[in-house]
Amino acid sequence: MESDKNGPARQENDIAEKESDIRYWTRVVCPSVRSLLHAAGSYTAEDIEAQMRTLREVVLPDLGPRPSRAPGPSYLFQGGCPFQLSINTTSKANAVRYVWEVLGERGHTSDDPLAMQTTRDTVSRLSAKFGLSTKWSDVLLSALELTTKEAQKAVEKMPEWILEHLEKGAVVPRIKNLPFGFVAFDLKESDVSIKLYITLKAREIFTGKSAADVIFDSLRNFTPAFKPEAIDMIQNFLSGLSEKMPLEVIAIDCVDEAHLSEARVKLYCHSTSNSFNTVKKWLTIGGKVKDENTLKGLQILRSMWHLFIQKPEGIPDDELETPVNLENALKHRMYFSFELKPGQDIPQVKTYLPIWRYAPSDEQAIDNFEAAFRQCHHPWGEDGTYGRIFRNALCAPPIHGDLAYIYCEKRGVYQTIYVTPPLLEED
């Protein structure tokens, strides 16, 4: 009888705690999202309210317990928040997107140490709600998942792996878990387009072997099919690098069955070099891609490179290796992504810089980004506009996370700036 009495009471307490969790994440996340939606200038008032409803109803419950109840912090982004905002800027329009680590109630508990089952459950829930195909996600999750015991073993092996990959002189972080799955929403008017990201590192830490072959074998069996030559181009390039296990994350567009032929796969990799010659090597895929679009994009990027690596005075040559902030840092200096589409001959390559590792302060980063915007004739470079937008969206530093760059003839310079809301004191 005692258990019967306690059952409803526990249930009521669980409901109350979950409501408190959502109130907390509402305070952390919603003001920044609303602020950037307004600043983008691309959304009507009705669009903004629709996007805020989607955020509250679909995303906030998936962020898991608030920090005081969570089994451990999120390590996906700087500052411990499992949610990151970004804004895509071009000369024609700006767009907001966000990404969150899939945690839910059970993620990082003993039942689901790396939130792998939680990721699968979330994918199933989103696919049912938005009518998405799971053909690609099922293949990737099955290829990269571990059992509960294997996941726990991977967690136990993490300290050794971190020491091996840490910058010399960096502070050793006390990491208790590892991100596995995260989801992104690109906000398009009142709708969203969805991406799923899955990290390879848990499997690699557990097995001690690269998971790249597993990924490339999976891609070769996807339908609609990718061109084997495009997959080979990426695989051969990566196998010729000095970096050990450079492939970090795979992402897929989540679409309905009828639009799989238009969906993309993106492969995210790290580089331990940050010279501009390294950028050239990656963007041309080892010198194999030298079309007019790629070369023009490189020329424009070179003209702004000193601003992105926070060297406004300029750099002497393309061999320069720029020192980075060392605290809690792996040996990763830059990131690149390869984008594949079914039937596409040549992958597209995008450059990513972890700005928090380069900028001595947010104020200097703001000055440098405003200078870069002026070079692109973007209005955010004028009269301190960029600085005001991000100070309004994020009440406390650090503001800057990462920067992404790609050029295409249709859209011109396409930059994405990533920012993470700070965690707040709990009520």
From Swiss-Prot:
Pathway assigned in UniProt: Secondary metabolite biosynthesis
Name of the gene: idtF
Residue positions binding substrate: R97, K195, R264, K266, Y268, Y352
Entry-linked InterPro entries: Aro_prenylTrfase, Aro_prenylTrfase_DMATS
The family this protein is said to belong to: Belongs to the tryptophan dimethylallyltransferase family.
Protein name: Indole diterpene prenyltransferase idtF
Primary role: Indole diterpene prenyltransferase; part of the gene cluster that mediates the biosynthesis of paspalitrems, indole-diterpene (IDT) mycotoxins that are potent tremorgens in mammals. The geranylgeranyl diphosphate (GGPP) synthase idtG is proposed to catalyze the first step in IDT biosynthesis via catalysis of a series of iterative condensations of isopentenyl diphosphate (IPP) with dimethylallyl diphosphate (DMAPP), geranyl diphosphate (GPP), and farnesyl diphosphate (FPP), to form GGPP.
GO BP terms, alphabetized: alkaloid metabolic process
